[in-house]
Amino acid sequence: MSIIVTGSIATDHLMVYSGRFTEQILPEALDSISVSFLVDDLAIHRGGAGANIAFNLGCLGLAPVLVGAVGADFAEYGQWLSAHGVDVSAVHVSQTKHTARFLCTTDSDQNQIASFYPGAMSEARDIELKPIVDRLGGADLVLIGPNDPAGMLRHTRECRDLGYPFAADPSQQLASLEGDQIAELVEGAAYLFTNTYERGLLERKTGWSDEDVLERVGVSVMTRGAKGVTVQRPGEPVVSVTPPQELAKADPTGVGDAFRAGFLAGVEWGVSDERAAQLGCMLATLVIESVGTQEHKLEPGTFMERFSEAYGPDSAAEVADHVRG
């Protein structure tokens, strides 16, 4: 059986403008803006939470099944994911829309002008999980990551109705969801992933307390930035893990996705919550050291050396055979 990852699939188009936006935008003409910036650099990165998580699971030697919606322009991206161990056979290809993309221009003052085109992502709501699970002969876990909100709700209901164990990872979509929708996404999840801000937002919108959340999920996993992560199970002591020291801090984008992949790999391998969280933190550290969410390389030997330095040889011995395949 496999881990199924549902979530967004997108590309990031990042441009750099050497001037200052404020020198080109006239305050007295804000009601009729028409400006163009000659940019100096363009970087295109593969992204989307679902694709990032699946990519990192593939790097750890698992064979995740990615479920999401893309456009006909996905072919090259799909080949990249396949080459890194991701099963993309369940990805829906839109006949009318392009793959979602984020376009952002940053000026010399670090001001940004950005746009997000959801595109084919809106068709994620048309994907049915049952035929995919039937073809696979079952699923160990379905991760429901940030995506088209209607698609997230559909997939959660389907998991609940058909008895598929699922992990809730609403992430940035919490901001646009109502409390009752959030409750529906979370109730009965085997795992709930949030960061500290998202956890506060979830509790405010649902009216739940920490205890209420723990009563509704099997395991609560909360990332805390540089402070690491806490893992809670109802009635058990909290597990806290700090991240390894990074060699450089290049770009935090995609760090949370990498953590989720590492943690879920640990779940799939049957290791403890602490060990799973350590795997997630180690993988997240690799991502923060590179620009782009899928630009890092996971060399098993180096990965395990750093893991052992951070968490000790006994901890490393428990996961080494899995990481090295």
Per-range role (PLM):
Residues 1-65, 76, 248, 314-325:
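Glycine-rich phosphate/adenosyl-contacting loop at the front of the ribokinase-like
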Residues 7-8, 68-72, 93, 106-108, ...:
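Cofactor-binding loop segments of dinucleotide-utilizing enzymes, especially the Rossmann-like FAD-
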Residues 58, 160, 268:
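Gly/Ala-rich phosphate-binding loop of Rossmann-like dinucleotide-binding domains
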Residues 63-90:
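A glycine-rich beta-to-alpha transition motif near the start of alpha/beta enzyme domains, typified by
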Residues 89-94, 102-141, 145-146:
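Conserved phosphate-binding/catalytic loop of the ribokinase/pfkB sugar-kinase fold
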Residues 160-165, 171-240, 248:
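Conserved phosphate/ATP/ADP-binding segment of small-molecule kinases
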Residues 207-325:
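Conserved phosphate-binding/catalytic region of the ribokinase-like
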